[in-house]
């Protein structure tokens, strides 16, 4: 499922926990192996809310990163979490975790 684009390229925030963004980035390690970083960034102050490093871009990586981010999150805050349309962000399990914690899903357009 593709979520609406709630950010509409407005990457500014006036307070913490208004707008978060996430993606998975591939890096090459010194030994030639690939490492994948999955962070959540708060657009208010560019702080990393949570992150996970993995040797493969899999659901467990995204789930761990997301569960770190929701610890202590007030469901009423209504934070927007924006991503691309990657398969991880379209999963039912991902959308369920967002809904359970009052997070509004947003996706960019291709």
Go through each PLM region and give its residues.
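Charged DNA-binding/catalytic regions of mobile-element recombinases
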Residues: 1-110
């Amino acid at each position: 499922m593709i979520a609406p684009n709630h950010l509409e390229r407005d990457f500014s925030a006036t307070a913490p926990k208004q707008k978060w963004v996430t993606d998975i980035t591939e890096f090459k390690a010194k030994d030639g192996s690939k490492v994948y970083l999955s962070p959540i960034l708060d657009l208010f102050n560019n702080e990393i809310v949570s992150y996970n490093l993995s040797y493969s871009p899999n659901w467990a990586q995204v789930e761990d990163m997301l569960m770190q981010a929701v610890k202590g999150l007030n469901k009423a805050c209504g934070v927007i979490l924006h991503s691309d349309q990657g398969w991880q962000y379209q999963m039912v399990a991902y959308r369920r975790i967002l809904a359970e914690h009052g997070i509004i899903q947003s996706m960019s357009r291709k």
